């Protein structure tokens, strides 16, 4: 992979898109994870205005520390970068109390609240984006966005542009190393940070990113039954998740009215 060439390509693509959209730059949500670290660094290299937002909601201290350290590093390196921490915990707590229901009656309550966290962050990003004339830069990678749908509809999936959505997680790590993203972020176990209890991406999806990348490469030309053991299991997981996520990537269905009814 031509890492430097890919970096230059994405940075130029970002600059061109912002110019066409007549935007001043980008706002990026920074979580302390690898994807947001890479996207924010790429945005910083455009020399356009960049606002980094850290938006903790009952967040673990290690995630907060990584996010704040990363924002500090970028501010030191790039004069076009500004950073802000917006604690969304009080707003989320108020929302959760207002809509509280019995978990016994509604077993999907915790999942609904996890997605609500993501949507609250999306609302915040667009609020600050509109204040400053900035585009919301998404941080989803190829596996998450087009493979297994590991994102929240109208949450972290609600963005203006997706700079790294054509890169697998492994490729994102390669860019991170080239961009000199901190070792703490590069070594951190991937997690979406949407739960009160620690849940890694692998635990939630049932497979690691390298495993899912393999499954994505053989999906369509092979079936789970073509393999044995763990490979069969992983491809079955990928197939199930990929089919279930189609509503996230397909256009919103529109009820077409027959011509004769007009």
Model-derived segments and their meaning:
Residues 120:
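His/acidic metal-ligating clusters that form di-metal
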Residues 1-5:
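An N-terminal, well-structured beta->alpha segment
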Residues 36:
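N-terminal Rossmann-fold NAD(P) dinucleotide-binding loop
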Residues 6-26, 41-51, 58-61, 70-116, ...:
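ATP/NTP-dependent adenylation/nucleotidyl-transfer catalytic domains that generate, transfer
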Residues 67:
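Conserved SAM-binding loop
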